UniProtKB/Swiss-Prot annotation:
Residues 94-95 form a propeptide. This is Small ubiquitin-related modifier 2-B. Polymeric chains can be formed through Lys-11 cross-linking. Cleavage of precursor form by a sentrin-specific protease is necessary for function. Belongs to the ubiquitin family. SUMO subfamily. SUPFAM superfamilies: Ubiquitin-like. The gene is sumo2-b.
Length: 95
């Protein structure tokens, strides 16, 4: 019978949103609030605009894995306050 009551401390509202941190190589951290089923390209574009970067210049990774523009936080099993890492695209390599 006790199981019928909602558990205290469990968020029931805002469960479709997630707070994510985007960490740049320069140590900067930008926070975003995004829906769990929204493609991450929306966050990626917003980050680029805010930082004055081009999507072609940088790569986004979560837990060391590349993020595709069509991926969603739900697909990647992201949790609240998770961090996405941003890396500058490396070009060339020979002199």
């Amino acid at each position: 019978m006790a199981d019928d009551k909602p558990k205290e401390g469990v968020k029931t509202e805002n469960n479709d949103h997630i707070n994510l941190k985007v960490a740049g190589q320069d140590g900067s951290v930008v926070q975003f609030k995004i829906k769990r089923h929204t493609p991450l390209n929306k966050l990626m574009k917003a980050y680029c605009e805010r930082q004055g970067l081009s999507m072609r210049q940088i790569r986004f990774r979560f837990d060391g894995q590349p993020i595709n523009e069509t991926d969603t936080p739900a697909q990647l099993e992201m949790e609240d306050e998770d961090t996405i890492d941003v890396f500058q695209q490396q070009t060339g390599g020979s002199y």
